[in-house]
């Protein structure tokens, strides 16, 4: 498939280009602007990151979100990152989701990431931003 072709509903569940990279097709269902605008996307800085005990997947992030309070978000990215390599990184989070308890720890938000397959192997990349962007900056 040419990289410039548009993904349509006729495309199967996975799109593969000539590099062996597979991506999921675009959603067909549209979200109205009012619904989308309720999501609060903010820049966060990783102050600390550690593996969650008894979990193979979860990392616990302590984040600066530009407020006086430190934010905790858990994310199932341990298969793709070691905790120490994420300290100091600038990431993107949705911060107005209700807290969700995982492994007895409240996760207050969601870090955004991109998922794709390369030659059948799943890859994940956290959305990392320029370090010059301050914690708490709102994305529009």
Give the location of each predicted region:
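Phosphate-backbone binding interfaces of nucleic-acid-interacting proteins
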Residues: 1-140
């Amino acid at each position: 498939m040419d990289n410039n072709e548009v993904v349509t509903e006729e495309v199967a569940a996975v799109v593969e280009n000539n590099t062996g990279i597979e991506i999921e097709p675009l959603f067909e269902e549209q979200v109205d602007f009012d619904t989308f605008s309720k999501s609060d996307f903010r820049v966060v800085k990783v102050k600390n990151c550690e593996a969650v005990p008894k979990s193979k997947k979860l990392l616990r992030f302590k984040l600066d979100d530009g407020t006086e309070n430190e934010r905790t978000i858990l994310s199932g990215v341990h298969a793709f990152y070691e905790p120490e390599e994420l300290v100091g990184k600038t990431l993107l989070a949705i911060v107005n989701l209700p807290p969700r308890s995982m492994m007895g720890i409240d996760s207050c938000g969601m870090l955004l990431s991109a998922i794709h397959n390369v030659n059948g192997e799943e890859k994940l990349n956290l959305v990392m931003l320029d370090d010059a962007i301050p914690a708490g900056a709102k994305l529009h």
